[in-house]
């Protein structure tokens, strides 16, 4: 039986190695238990910071896109507005001329 136990037992260097690994895992576990809330707060803050940066970039690019649209489309909008205004002015002038002729006819 003793010989059988000797065959199963590992050499001391291997046992020391496994003991060191288990102590490392225990220290990591203790560190996690001690700083669990701090780690959660840190993770929440980093995630919030990433979200804020992404939202800021999205807003920046959308504002830049709207600025480009305004810069390039403003002349087109101005010309269409001018044409619309000219068309309205012509119509108004025609209506006024007709009214003024009628008023002159009525007055005379």
UniProtKB/Swiss-Prot annotation:
Compositionally biased region (Basic residues):
88-101
| Residues spanning the membrane | 39-59
Does this entry carry the keyword Iron-sulfur? no
Q: Is Kinase found in the keyword set?
A: no
Q: Keywords of this protein's UniProt record, alphabetized?
A: Membrane, Transmembrane, Transmembrane helix
Renumbered to this chain, region (Disordered) spans 88-108
Subcellular location field: Membrane
What membrane topology does this protein have? Single-pass membrane protein
Q: What name does this protein carry? A: Protein alpha-1
